[in-house]
Design a protein with these regions (language model features):
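Acyl-donor (CoA/ACP) binding surface of acyl/acetyltransferases
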Residues: 1-32, 66-167
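Hydrophobic residues in alpha-helical segments
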Residues: 25, 34, 56-58
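Conserved GNAT-fold acetyl-CoA-binding loop/helix
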Residues: 29-51
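A short helix-loop-beta-strand connector motif used in the catalytic cores of GNAT acetyltransferases and
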Residues: 53-66
């Protein structure tokens, strides 16, 4: 599946995207604000994508979309739309390499995912989680029109900041 905006193309993740995801998953900001995947090589990342991410999380129009900058045709980030066990609504997420930050790409990609969620998947609400200390992500969600709901435990006993957007 492919989604696009004026400046970006969002393609469903593939195992051959492993070099990009290895770089993203090992970015210090990704580790600090999202999760440490503890992947030590491109080969480990390829296996992770092939065995865990793609088969478990990418189906029924949901999953991880590699975000490409159209002008240079290079991957700069990821946007996701997931169904989580402890929630009733789809969860939008994003992460960008330093090369893709500060240019409005996260806003543009997330807005694209939101439009897809409403128009194609026919959802009336979408949610997003972010770590409480991730101020940049909170600002982005607020700019997109999300409302802060409070803290909610989503996994591993940690409470994340929950935001919602009603279409």
């Amino acid at each position: 599946m492919i989604l696009s905006t004026e400046r970006l193309t969002l393609k469903m993740v593939e195992a051959n995207d492993a070099p990009f995801y290895f770089e993203l998953f090992n970015d210090p900001d990704f580790i600090k604000n999202i999760n440490d995947k503890n992947l030590k090589s491109v080969e480990e990342t390829h296996t992770f994508l092939q065995q865990k991410m793609i088969p478990n999380l990418c189906n029924d129009g949901l999953g991880f979309f590699t975000v490409y900058e159209n002008e240079r045709n290079i991957p700069i980030g990821v946007s996701s739309l997931l169904s989580r066990e402890k929630t009733d609504y789809y969860d939008v997420g994003y992460a960008f390499l330093p090369i893709g930050r500060g240019k409005g790409y996260a806003f543009e990609a997330t807005e694209c995912i939101m439009k897809y969620t409403k128009e194609v998947l026919k959802q009336d609400k979408i949610i997003a989680f972010t770590m409480p200390q991730n101020q940049a992500s909170k600002r982005l969600l607020t700019k997109l029109g999300f409302n802060y709901i409070g803290l909610k435990e989503i996994h591993q006993g940690n409470k994340d900041s929950l935001f919602e957007y009603i279409f």
